[in-house]
Structures are given as structure tokens and as C-alpha cells.
Curated annotation (Swiss-Prot):
UniProt record similarity statement: Belongs to the UPF0102 family.
Lineage, uppermost ranks: Bacteria, Pseudomonadati, Pseudomonadota, Gammaproteobacteria, Enterobacterales
UniProt xrefs under InterPro entries: Restrct_endonuc-II-like (IPR011335), tRNA_endonuc-like_dom_sf (IPR011856), UPF0102_YraN-like (IPR003509)
Organism: Salmonella typhi
Protein name, entry field: UPF0102 protein YraN
SUPFAM superfamilies: Restriction endonuclease-like
Leader peptide range in chain numbering: none
Amino acid sequence: MAQIPARGDCSRQLTRKQAGDAWEAAARLWLESKGLRFIAANVRERGGEIDLIMRDGKTTVFVEVRYRRSGLYGGAAASVTRSKQHKLLHTARLWLARQNGSFDTVDCRFDVLAFTGNEIEWFRDAFNDHS
């Protein structure tokens, strides 16, 4: 696992993919410290990818991890656009179908874990299939 460099050094020392993987690993550890259980990472289905799938009790949690160096232009959370939400919903729908489930049969939610500079914001149930 790549180490997350000190603030501001990320883009110079790691490729975009390596930096993303490092932030996702940090997100996983942070969420596990909050009691969530890891299910899968970087789940790819036709048309999209889910960064993390976790379990919070009986709830399946689809997590989008975002990092921005600063809060300028809205910060990390603001980068999860309506279009991105639709892609995540579609990807989750396909993943659930592979698990013999659906939004109707599985208790699930969509969280965003946003790293902006040195701050972490956890947006539980940030959006849903009724948004």
C-alpha cells in the first residue's frame, strides 16, 4: 500500500491511480475504526466503479472516496455530481444483482467520505435511488 504523503505532496510523488488507491486505503481503515466491516474495494461493473463496499450492521454501504487539496471550488464532497451519483447507483444495482439482491431486498446506503486537506467529512446516506 502506498503511503499518503504530507499535505500537498500527493500529486508530485504518486501517480493519480496510486494516490487514489492510498486515499481509498486510508478511507477503509478510517471506516473500520468507526465499526464498519470491509466487503470489497474497487468493484467494477459495466459503466462504473465503486471505491469501497462496507457493512454497517446489516446495511450494505457503498462508499465513494474523494480527495481535494483544498476547499476551493467546493471541496471533495462537491465533486460527487448528480452524474456520478447515477453511475454509482447503476453500478451498485448491477453488483447487488450479482449477489442475488436488489435495492428492494437489501438494506443499503450510499456514503461519501471526503478528504479535504487534512479534514475528513463522512456523509452518511449522501444520496439514494430516490434522489
